[in-house]
A protein has these predicted regions:
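P-loop NTPase switch/coupling surface
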Residues: 1-103, 114-118
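Contiguous mid-protein beta-loop-alpha structural module that forms a pocket-lining wall or clamp
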Residues: 208
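Walker B catalytic acidic pair
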Residues: 199-201
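ABC ATPase nucleotide-binding domain "signature" loop
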Residues: 203-205
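Extended helical coiled-coil dimerization/tether regions that scaffold
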Residues: 91-195
Length: 208
């Protein structure tokens, strides 16, 4: 948070609403050296309701790690003593291609009893949205799963979470991310929207 206070809200997968550079990029010790990246960009900060016109992203050296460290500079300051070298304050969920790992290849996979009350409340809306996305009407029950990947899957009365397809599981992960933002909006008074990044969103969107 920009004022240094902790924001302890979690997604329905039990993670923080943020994504680190290492989830998106792998920097080379040989070629990605300090000073070799100099990016300037502009973004609208919904929290401050202002455009940040001159944000800079550069690579810097670090004594405690072999790779260069990406740092954002020239962010907005609340007062003169604030540090402008900070990331933009905005809730974010990133779903990588790891979400498409087949259930049979996951070392751990089981039902998850966390957030049962919330999932019970949204189960009808979750199921309807899932069926609409996959073009099916057989989905009737939501099961939250845990293990190698956190997910929530919709299945019918004649099979359970053990037998769902990659498409059903992938759709469940996407919906769980969307409903995570809905839950955050209900609980966080300073909510101003969020960002959902999905790597190759069309991959795996098939019902069986």
């Amino acid at each position: 948070h920009f004022d240094g206070s902790d924001i302890n809200f979690k997604t329905l997968a039990g993670k923080n609403f943020k994504s680190s550079f290492r989830e998106h990029f792998r920097f080379s010790k040989t070629y990605d050296l300090p000073g070799t990246m100099d990016v300037e960009f502009e973004i609208f900060d919904a929290y401050f309701k202002k455009i940040i016109p001159d944000l800079k992203l550069r690579l810097y050296g670090s004594e405690d790690r072999p790779q260069s460290r990406p740092v954002v500079r020239d962010n907005l300051k609340v007062d003169a003593e604030d540090n402008s070298s900070r990331n933009v304050t905005h809730p974010l969920i990133y779903l990588s291609l790891k979400r498409l790992m087949p259930i049979a290849e996951r070392s751990k996979y089981s039902l998850n009893s966390e957030e049962v009350e919330y999932f019970t409340r949204i189960s009808r809306e979750f199921t309807i949205t899932n069926n609409r996305l996959l073009g099916k009407i057989s989905g009737t029950t939501v099961s939250k799963t845990t293990g190698t990947i956190e997910s929530a899957v919709v299945h019918g009365n004649n099979y359970d979470h053990e037998s769902v397809s990659v498409g059903e599981d992938n759709t469940g992960q996407i919906l769980m991310a969307l409903f995570s933002f809905q839950k955050l909006k209900e609980e966080y008074v300073d909510y101003h929207g969020g960002i959902l990044l999905i790597d190759e969103i069309d991959a795996g969107l098939f019902p069986a």
